[in-house]
């Protein structure tokens, strides 16, 4: 899974890139091909049927060359509509996914589960992921990991628990795209955010608004490198995350 950090790409002995690529729809040289898929008429029609909304905004995308060993999670912890629960995502198979490649999975019915999170779990990703890992240990037999073929798309709700199975054979790639869509009538945020995120820039493609990648994720500089490293470090340590949140509240007064 993308770490939101600036990293050098690591290539496996089989020639696959280990890291996922974040916001591939806003990548130079790659964006046009990806946007043709993610904003296609077929996708827009499917989104309308699933949500009942006429228009949707593309908020985030990722490309996977290899199984990135994504842990069990719910999207609404990281990005969602406000009010929560209306964002949805799609997993696009770019090749036939072999069962030993580490298939994508969902936990059917998990969108109805409302986990009570303590303060550490609300602000620190590591605590939240640990909670879901323990939950999945008791529900591993309930997961659904379909044998997706090239061109297949699996959509799920922002509350649905999902992730990827372990890779059994590293000789197999798992080329795929993931995209997150927000009905355009809703504001953008995440589950434990009190106010929507308003400083968002969009561009238009095929009648769909697409969120532009944040500059600190799009343009490399020492400043942006340090900024993302510090943020990710705090995000994995509850005490630091609490201190940071307290300082932000004091500054906002």
Model feature map: region roles:
Residues 1-81, 119:
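Non-heme Fe(II)-dependent double-stranded beta-helix
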Residues 42, 75-87, 141-142, 148, ...:
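A short beta-loop-beta micro-motif enriched in histidine and acidic residues
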Residues 62, 74-76, 92-96, 108:
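Short, structured patches in soluble enzyme cores that scaffold and shape functional sites
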Residues 66, 107-114, 174, 180-186:
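Short edge-strand/loop segments of extracellular domains
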Residues 74-77, 91-92, 140-142, 161-164:
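Glycine-rich, charged/polar anion/phosphate-binding loops
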Residues 81-99, 147-150, 155, 180-185:
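Short, conserved beta-strand element in jelly-roll/cupin
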Residues 97-161:
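Double-stranded beta-helix
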Residues 121, 153-155, 159-253:
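Non-heme Fe(II)/2-oxoglutarate
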């Amino acid at each position: 899974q993308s770490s939101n950090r600036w990293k050098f790409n690591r290539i496996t002995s089989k020639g696959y890139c280990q890291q996922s690529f974040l916001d591939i729809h806003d990548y130079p040289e790659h964006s046009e091909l990806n946007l043709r898929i993610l904003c296609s008429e077929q996708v827009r029609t499917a989104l309308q049927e699933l949500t009942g909304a006429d228009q949707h905004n593309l908020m985030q995308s990722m490309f996977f060359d290899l199984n990135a060993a994504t842990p069990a999670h719910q999207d609404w912890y990281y990005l969602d509509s406000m009010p929560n629960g209306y964002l949805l995502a799609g997993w696009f198979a770019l090749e036939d996914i072999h069962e030993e490649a580490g298939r994508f999975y969902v936990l059917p019915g998990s969108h109805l589960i409302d986990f009570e999170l303590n303060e550490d779990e609300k602000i620190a990703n590591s605590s939240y992921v640990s909670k879901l890992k323990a939950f999945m240990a008791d529900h591993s037999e309930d997961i659904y990991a379909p044998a997706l073929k090239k061109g297949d798309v699996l959509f799920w709700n922002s509350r649905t628990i999902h992730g990827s199975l372990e890779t059994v054979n590293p000789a197999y790639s798992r080329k795929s795209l993931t995209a997150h869509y927000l009905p355009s009538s809703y504001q953008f945020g995440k589950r434990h955010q009190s106010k929507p995120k308003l400083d968002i820039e969009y561009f238009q493609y095929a009648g769909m608004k697409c969120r532009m990648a944040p500059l600190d994720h799009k343009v490399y500089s020492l400043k942006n490198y340090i900024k993302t490293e510090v943020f990710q470090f705090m995000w994995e340590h509850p005490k630091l995350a609490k201190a940071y949140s307290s300082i932000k509240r004091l500054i906002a007064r």
